[in-house]
A protein has these predicted regions:
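Short, charged beta-turn/beta-strand-edge "cap" motif at the junction between a beta-strand
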Residues: 25, 64-68, 120, 205-209
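Gly/Pro-biased beta-strand-loop elements
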Residues: 65-168, 192, 220-284
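Short acidic, glycine/serine/threonine-rich helix-capping segments at coil-helix boundaries
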Residues: 18, 42-55
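N-terminal targeting pre-sequences for secretion and organelle import
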Residues: 191-233
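Primarily a LysM-type cell-wall glycan-binding module
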Residues: 3-34
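Flexible, glycine-rich surface segments
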Residues: 155-206
């Protein structure tokens, strides 16, 4: 599929390759391709410094994604793959990498809606946040020191927002106080697309499965240790992903369950590369 925003199957986008330059960082490469550097770490069999990856390294840029299960309308925020999906209509979609709440400040699951849009928002740190960091002022004016960035979408869940950030490297990580952060350029796009009243569904699907061109795929996500806070206790172990993978694949395959190569499913879980992997038996 050549058009990243067109929906004709359960998958959108196409993976590409990139060869690093001397001045590159994984953070800059990720942002230039609208993914997170955690996506790059997961998708590639590399052990490199995100700040100095070196030159002439060929990297897979994971731009292909299986759409989450669920009604395809409004905004779906999947904390399982750290991505936000906005369904503009039944045929087109925008999707962006996100950062979410860390351990103890988990982003809540469930339905909400956008109740307010604000350019250059002022941040009023909640008392719970100020207890953690007493040096914070009661009000943070709009500007480069404001962690909300230059756009904010306020949710019907009290104190939770979809917003930009003044620390783009936090996109793709679980480091916030529960809000959903996007790259500055992505929140500007989303801000212009959506209106007040748009439905938001926050889900947790670290494993997704779906069809493209009569081929069945699985996509398994497990965050690299590098991007996790040491206090994170809510990370699902890979051993716990196997039964979930079987359940998800069975749901996606339906009556075509006999075409599934379960060894490929097991391997996909073990690798957890965060990219769609075809899981059909040969000649099926």
């Amino acid at each position: 599929m050549s058009n990243d925003n067109n929906i004709s199957n359960d998958l959108v986008g196409v993976n590409i390759f990139y060869t690093t330059n001397k001045e590159d960082t994984l953070i800059s490469i990720a942002r230039n391709h609208d993914i997170s550097f955690a996506d790059i770490l997961s998708a590639n069999d590399v052990n490199m410094d995100p700040w100095i990856p070196g030159e002439n390294k060929k990297l897979l840029i994971p731009k292909s994604h299986i759409l989450p299960f669920g009604k395809r309308e409004g905004i779906i925020i999947n904390i399982g793959d750290l991505r936000l999906y906005y369904f503009k209509d039944e045929n087109s979609i925008e999707n962006y990498p996100i950062g979410i709440g860390r351990s103890g400040w988990e982003t809540p699951l469930g339905y909400a809606k956008i109740i307010k849009k604000k350019k250059d928002p002022v941040w009023i740190p909640p008392e719970s946040v100020r207890k953690e960091d007493p040096s914070l002022p009661k009000v943070v004016a709009a500007g480069e020191d404001n962690p909300l960035g230059n756009r904010a979408l306020y949710l019907s869940i009290p104190s939770y927002l979809i917003h930009g950030t003044n620390k783009p490297y936090g996109v793709g990580m679980k480091v916030s106080h529960g809000c959903i952060r996007l790259y500055p350029e992505d929140i500007e796009k989303l801000f212009n697309y959506v209106s007040e009243g748009v439905r938001v569904n926050i889900i947790n699907q670290p494993i997704k499965a779906g069809w493209r061109n009569k081929k069945l795929y699985i996509e398994v996500h497990s965050l690299p240790e590098y991007v996790l806070e040491k206090s994170n206790k809510d990370i699902i172990k890979k051993s716990e992903l196997y039964p979930l993978a079987y359940e998800i694949v069975q749901k996606a395959a339906g009556v075509n369950i006999t075409v599934v190569d379960w060894n490929k499913v097991k391997e996909a879980v073990a690798l957890s590369k965060g990219i769609p992997i075809e899981i059909m038996l040969v000649n099926k």
